[in-house]
Amino acid sequence: MKAYENGGHAYHATMPTDALVRFRDIMFETKSYGFEAVKAQQWDLGNRARKLIEGMGFKSVASEGFKAPGVVVSYTQDSDIQNGKKFLAEGMQIAAGVPLQVNEGADFKTFRIGLFGLDKLQNIDATLDRLKGVFSKVA
């Protein structure tokens, strides 16, 4: 605190102003596009992406009634799908699943696909085409 009061500061304590400004700008963009439109498109994308992924043989972790529109978490037995290596080779970044922490065994593997961004919502068909192309190579 004394360093701050004396005009010094720690780098790690500075506000992430660039990220906050970008977030604000995106929120204004979303507002002008329409929150209800974005909500409807997010559900459409989420439902269609999950159907596509399940159609490729990857069962959803979420039960009916609990499937989120912005993320799909699926089971896999392939470590290179779970850790993202196969997706990365195709130019797609994923997250390595969700540790449920309910005594799942060492063989428990999931992967997570985030469906975030106005760019994805504003052209759902193109988003799904890219997703299908990647899944056809990694599955």
Predicted regions and their residues:
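Short, hydrophobic alpha-helical segments
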Residues: 31, 135-139
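Conserved C-terminal alpha-helix-loop-beta "cap" of PLP-dependent enzymes
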Residues: 54, 58-114, 118-126
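Active-site C-terminal subdomain of aminotransferase-like
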Residues: 1-55, 119
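Short amphipathic C-terminal alpha-helix that caps PH/PH-like domains
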Residues: 127-135
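A sequence-composition feature that detects small, non-aromatic residues
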Residues: 3, 10-13, 19, 37-40, ...
